[in-house]
């Protein structure tokens, strides 16, 4: 029996906003960027409203909620402020991530084991509002089991350690953890996504995991867009993911 699921591409637009915020200009226009990204094959648009507002701004979330035609995946910390924003904006999906002001980017998965009760209470009103809630977790079986107890229907596996490892035994070991975690979560009814640090090469083994549902990728796509344009960068990532599934 073929258990392979259709693989979705979530394009993270944070670093398009980073370029805008570097000079405080009205460009690049995120609405136009999203239009091109969606036409090029993105299945969902991901954006992270950080507490320090270093790239995505509140007005972006409000405006894009009305303009995105595929779906909005709002990444956010588990704070009262972010919960209130999500309940007001009602994105199609939200991903709960850990956050530290001094980090350059999200550095790891949520400590779901250490704050299980808190996360369950945090997620409950989001789920009740019809928002698809995912938890950004390490590829660890105990964390996936905790996500189930919390009630989140989706997990996003943190691929940062895999992506940062040099090709060879170390990266293979990280890949094996991700494969095992994906199978474990899928067997227990979780929808399994993945993301962080994925590029046009290291995405291939992750995309090849049969039960993987969605990959969220941003920095590599925006970096390639400097040379090819954002539409072609998205199409190239979509093509790489499709090759891995053949």
UniProtKB/Swiss-Prot annotation:
Signal sequence coordinates: none
Intracellular or extracellular location(s): Cytoplasm
Pfam families: PdxJ
Keyword field: Cytoplasm, Pyridoxine biosynthesis, Transferase
EC number: 2.6.99.2
Site-annotated residues for Transition state stabilizer: 156
Residues reported in the UniProt entry to bind 1-deoxy-D-xylulose 5-phosphate: 14-15, 50, 55, 105
GO cellular component: cytosol
Involved pathway(s): Cofactor biosynthesis; pyridoxine 5'-phosphate biosynthesis; pyridoxine 5'-phosphate from D-erythrose 4-phosphate: step 5/5
Active-site positions on this chain: 48 (proton acceptor), 75 (proton acceptor), 196 (proton donor)
Source superkingdom: Bacteria
Residues binding 3-amino-2-oxopropyl phosphate, per UniProt: 12, 23, 197, 218-219
Catalytic activity entry: 3-amino-2-oxopropyl phosphate + 1-deoxy-D-xylulose 5-phosphate = pyridoxine 5'-phosphate + phosphate + 2 H2O + H(+)
UniProt GO molecular function: pyridoxine 5'-phosphate synthase activity
GO terms of biological process kind: pyridoxine biosynthetic process
Subunit details: Homooctamer; tetramer of dimers.
Family membership: Belongs to the PNP synthase family.
Role of this protein: Catalyzes the complicated ring closure reaction between the two acyclic compounds 1-deoxy-D-xylulose-5-phosphate (DXP) and 3-amino-2-oxopropyl phosphate (1-amino-acetone-3-phosphate or AAP) to form pyridoxine 5'-phosphate (PNP) and inorganic phosphate.
Protein name: Pyridoxine 5'-phosphate synthase
